[in-house]
């Protein structure tokens, strides 16, 4: 029988609706060294508003290129939509602490309390709003595990837009119910790489039997957008605009901690392209950059796709088909195809340019973990905290447990905060593999990564 637990504070901390952030925070405004600009692959020069107009919505381009405006006011229609599921709770993981026997205090920001099951809705509704405001017919996008595609399909349905989703093939096959949610919201869902685009045909020819990647799906979605009048491409991670919208997570987290009188010592987030991590940590990074406070910030990525920990900081294509602008980021090479691991949302070869610059400046640090260890942590969390976590989120849980056990050894009572990005109820194939002992770890060899990095584009300067 579990020992009784004495609470020294609330389990859940909710902000009032009137405490919902009224503006997104742009961490670039506080970075003395700004992220390197996107480059036009044709000219090798920084992209302009006009370069991006055929691909992105106009207002989103302005947000993408603006390194100086600290706060962007959130439009009233978006704030009203946010109130359906925000503010989200900051939860004290008392039962996990008890199971670990750690003196650390563990908090998690839970973003899975909406139909999309994740934080992705924060940016999806914003991007759909700007597409509708521009008078577009529809949007195209990619999705890995399906959370982003689900969030976008919800948002386009809300605003009456068409939605075309290219879903990474391995996730399309592993998560059939996720695609049915998207279709319920009116989206069309195509496994990527497909035979419906030129880029998809090329990738299938070069990599027969490939299970796909986010880089492949991005290429197909961009091609589909530029070939259809009245359509634009929207992206669920990586871009500056996405991290801007996701800052609502960190702003709420900081406000809730302040309400509790708690200062975070360590902040942990999973990292694929950077949307969740960037959103969670940006207000804390801002304080750190301004010299107002110090925080230990840890990014956690899959060992099968270790962009930060084994990648190179260089200009690279954001997509496998090499149709997108070049971004300076930690990358494994745009031709790198990760193994078919179960954290589909983290299978991206690169990383946000903002987070890449912060990592290069040692403002944040990173680690990588194997998926079997990730699911061990996920199972313990489910059994103690009553939420079945998404595989992506469980990378942060794994690192949180490891750090809390270090506190057990040292006796430190650190305040650890992590991002629980979403739920894993559509990831039961992955949980089944783990429970049956059939899950294995794939870690790319140095030769695998070197082969991909050898194909990085040559960029002067």
Named regions from a protein language model:
Residues 115-126, 239-252, 390-395:
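A glycine-rich, Thr/Ser-enriched phosphate-binding loop motif common to dinucleotide/cofactor-binding enzymes
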């Amino acid at each position: 029988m579990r020992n009784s637990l004495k609470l020294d504070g609330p389990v859940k901390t909710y902000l009032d609706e009137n405490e919902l952030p009224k503006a997104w925070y742009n961490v670039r405004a506080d970075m003395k060294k700004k992220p390197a600009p996107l480059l036009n692959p044709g000219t090798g020069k920084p992209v302009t508003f006009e370069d991006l107009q055929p691909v992105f919505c106009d207002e989103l381009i302005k947000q993408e290129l603006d390194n100086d405006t600290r706060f962007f006011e959130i439009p009233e229609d978006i704030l009203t939509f946010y109130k359906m599921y925000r503010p989200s709770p900051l939860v004290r993981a008392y039962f996990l602490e008890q199971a670990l026997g750690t003196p650390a205090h563990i908090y998690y920001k839970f973003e899975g309390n909406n139909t999309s099951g994740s934080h992705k809705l924060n940016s999806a509704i914003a991007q759909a709003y700007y597409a509708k405001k521009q008078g577009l017919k529809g949007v195209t996008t990619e999705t890995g595990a399906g959370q982003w595609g689900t969030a976008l399909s919800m948002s386009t349905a809300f605003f009456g837009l068409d939605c075309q989703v290219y879903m990474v093939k391995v996730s399309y096959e592993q998560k059939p119910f996720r695609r049915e949610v998207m279709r319920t919201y009116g989206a069309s869902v195509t496994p990527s790489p497909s035979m419906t685009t030129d880029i998809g045909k090329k990738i299938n020819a070069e990599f027969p039997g490939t299970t796909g990647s986010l880089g492949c799906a991005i290429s197909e979605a961009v091609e589909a957008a530029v070939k259809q009048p009245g359509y634009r491409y929207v992206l669920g991670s990586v871009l500056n605009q996405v991290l801007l919208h996701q800052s609502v997570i960190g702003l709420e987290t900081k406000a809730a901690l302040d309400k509790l009188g708690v200062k975070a010592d360590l902040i942990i987030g999973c990292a694929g392209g950077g949307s969740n991590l960037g959103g969670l940590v940006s207000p804390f990074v801002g304080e750190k950059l301004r010299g107002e406070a110090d925080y230990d910030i840890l990014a956690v990525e899959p060992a099968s796709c270790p962009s930060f920990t084994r990648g190179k900081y260089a200009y690279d294509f954001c997509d496998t088909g090499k149709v997108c602008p070049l971004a300076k980021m930690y990358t494994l090479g745009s031709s790198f195809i990760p193994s078919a691991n179960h954290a589909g949302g983290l299978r991206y070869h690169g990383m946000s340019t903002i987070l890449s610059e912060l990592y290069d400046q040692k403002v944040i640090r990173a680690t990588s973990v194997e998926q079997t260890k990730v699911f061990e942590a996920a199972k313990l969390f489910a059994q103690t905290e009553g939420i079945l976590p998404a595989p992506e989120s469980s990378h942060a849980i794994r690192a949180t447990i490891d750090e809390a056990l270090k506190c057990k050894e040292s006796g430190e009572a650190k305040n650890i905060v992590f991002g629980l990005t979403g739920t894993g109820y559509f990831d039961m194939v992955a949980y089944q593999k783990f429970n049956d002992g059939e899950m294995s770890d794939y870690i790319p060899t140095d030769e695998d990564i070197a082969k991909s990095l050898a194909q990085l584009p040559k960029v002067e300067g």
